[in-house]
């Protein structure tokens, strides 16, 4: 079925567009599952991220299913039986894997499997990711590795 990739800069409206797509599917009677990859943070640890997560939660109707999964994107995606799956976002998922000290090849293998799983669904999938390669050259080795993965 259809796999749609929403790509853009940080805070460029990608998640809002995905939610709009979800609303259209929901209005047509199609179930919507939102797969959130952002780690749940305490507002004391990162108030900005906690606020963003809460805003995203408020944008989604209670009738949508939500799966909060930082690492096992393939398992989360395979648990969505029917309807639209929205993955928000691949950028955070990748950084979550890097913080778990997975190697680049292992991350690429997981990304390939996740893409195949999304493309192989009989229902539509919308995946969100940030564009990280058109900006300035990252100053740190970790930043360059992140961009390259």
List where the protein language model places each region.
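Helix-adjacent hinge/juxtasegments
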Residues: 58-107
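Conserved nucleotide-binding/hydrolysis micro-motifs of P-loop NTPases
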Residues: 39-42, 91-92, 132-134
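Conserved P-loop
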Residues: 2-79
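Residues at secondary-structure transition points
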Residues: 12-13, 41-47, 51, 85, ...
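Generic beta-sheet signal
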Residues: 2-6, 32, 83-89, 125-127
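Glycine-centered flexibility motif
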Residues: 8-9, 83, 133, 137
């Amino acid at each position: 079925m259809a796999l749609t990739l929403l790509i853009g800069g940080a805070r460029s409206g990608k998640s809002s567009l995905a939610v709009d797509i979800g609303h259209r599917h929901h209005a047509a009677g199609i179930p919507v599952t939102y797969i959130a990859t952002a780690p749940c943070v305490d507002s004391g640890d990162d108030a900005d991220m906690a606020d963003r997560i809460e805003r995203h939660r408020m944008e989604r109707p209670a009738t949508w299913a939500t799966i909060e999964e930082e690492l096992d994107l393939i398992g989360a995606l395979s648990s969505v039986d029917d309807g639209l799956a929205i993955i928000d976002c691949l950028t955070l998922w990748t950084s979550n894997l890097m913080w778990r000290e997975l190697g680049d090849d292992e991350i690429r293998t997981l990304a390939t499997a996740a893409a195949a799983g999304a493309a192989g669904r009989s229902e539509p999938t919308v995946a969100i990711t940030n564009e990280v390669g058109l900006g300035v050259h990252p100053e740190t080795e970790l930043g360059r590795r992140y961009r390259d993965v």
